[in-house]
């Protein structure tokens, strides 16, 4: 398996060349993951599909990702803070009002170009090999990527889902519209700055005899307290290391 992955890695590097931003081989998991720039996405995907030794003829999945606050620790335990469960019982806070911010608190103002990404899972049926491709949107405020529907027709609904949930625009998509939420939905619910309780709620009005939108009436309350336990997964190894150092 490791040798086959190394051969695939070499083939990908040779075929994509400078279009390859990153290439990570995880032999333990049997995975190869690459990253390409948005300007090179469509051409790189076409190469991955058509090139000899690659032949990724199937797009198995496409998922949007919001990396806002990725790698930051939200499990503060010494003080009460706005990113924990406490915000669910405080009235008139950012999460309640729907003001943009990480977990409903800090406002997002910096454009990092590393917030929104699309991740593609590719399969070569002919060569029985897999590849993960990631591509970041350059603009956090208006994330755009090229559509790959003309490369793999199965990308159609995948891209619509990523647009619906994350607001990623796929340029060149033949019918880019919502697929999971209704057409009047406000915002993109999988973004990390989307209010936990939403912006509006929908109900059937008996008098008007139709479905109506109204302000959220939910009173959010967390009934299960946050419990932070000590991490004992490596306790035995830690004790052995401490014993060795004492000796």
Swiss-Prot record:
Keyword Transcription: no
EC number(s) on file: 7.1.1.-
Membrane topology (UniProt): Peripheral membrane protein
Subcellular localization: Cell inner membrane
Enzyme class, broadest EC rank: translocase
Molecular functions per Gene Ontology: NADH dehydrogenase (ubiquinone) activity; NADH:ubiquinone reductase (non-electrogenic) activity; quinone binding
Catalytic activity: a quinone + NADH + 5 H(+)(in) = a quinol + NAD(+) + 4 H(+)(out)
UniProt keyword Ribonucleoprotein present: no
SUPFAM superfamilies in the record: Nqo5-like
Top-rank taxon: Bacteria
Keyword terms: Cell inner membrane, Cell membrane, Membrane, NAD, Quinone, Translocase, Transport, Ubiquinone
Main location: membrane
GO cellular component, one term: plasma membrane
Quaternary organization: NDH-1 is composed of 14 different subunits. Subunits NuoB, C, D, E, F, and G constitute the peripheral sector of the complex.
Function: NDH-1 shuttles electrons from NADH, via FMN and iron-sulfur (Fe-S) centers, to quinones in the respiratory chain. The immediate electron acceptor for the enzyme in this species is believed to be ubiquinone. Couples the redox reaction to proton translocation (for every two electrons transferred, four hydrogen ions are translocated across the cytoplasmic membrane), and thus conserves the redox energy in a proton gradient.
HAMAP family, per the entry: NDH1_NuoC
Family: Belongs to the complex I 30 kDa subunit family.
PANTHER family, alphabetized: NADH DEHYDROGENASE [UBIQUINONE] IRON-SULFUR PROTEIN 3, MITOCHONDRIAL, NADH DEHYDROGENASE UBIQUINONE IRON-SULFUR PROTEIN 3
NCBIfam families the record matches: PRK06074.1-1
Protein name, as recorded: NADH-quinone oxidoreductase subunit C
Gene: nuoC
């Amino acid at each position: 398996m490791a040798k086959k992955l190394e051969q695939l890695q070499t083939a990908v590097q040779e075929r994509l060349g400078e279009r390859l931003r990153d290439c990570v081989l995880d032999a333990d998991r049997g995975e190869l993951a690459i990253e390409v720039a948005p300007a090179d996405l469509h051409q790189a995907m076409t190469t991955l599909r058509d090139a000899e030794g690659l032949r990724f003829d199937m797009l198995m999945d496409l998922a949007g990702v919001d990396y806002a606050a990725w790698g930051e620790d939200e499990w503060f335990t010494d003080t009460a803070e706005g990113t924990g469960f406490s915000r669910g019982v405080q009235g008139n806070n950012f999460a309640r009002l729907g003001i943009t911010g990480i977990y409903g608190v800090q406002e997002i103002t910096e454009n990092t170009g590393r917030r929104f990404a699309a991740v593609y899972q590719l399969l070569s049926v002919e060569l029985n090999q897999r590849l993960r491709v990631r591509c970041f949107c350059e603009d956090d405020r208006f994330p755009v990527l090229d559509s790959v529907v003309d490369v793999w027709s199965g990308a159609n609904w995948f891209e619509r889902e990523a647009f619906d949930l994350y607001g990623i625009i796929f340029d060149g998509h033949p019918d880019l519209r919502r697929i999971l939420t209704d057409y009047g939905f406000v915002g993109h619910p999988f973004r990390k700055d989307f209010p936990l309780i939403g912006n509006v709620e929908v109900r059937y009005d008996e008098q008007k005899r139709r479905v109506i939108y109204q302000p959220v009436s939910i009173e959010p309350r967390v009934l299960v307290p946050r419990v932070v336990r000590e991490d004992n997964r490596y306790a035995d190894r830690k004790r052995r290391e401490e014993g060795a150092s004492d000796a």
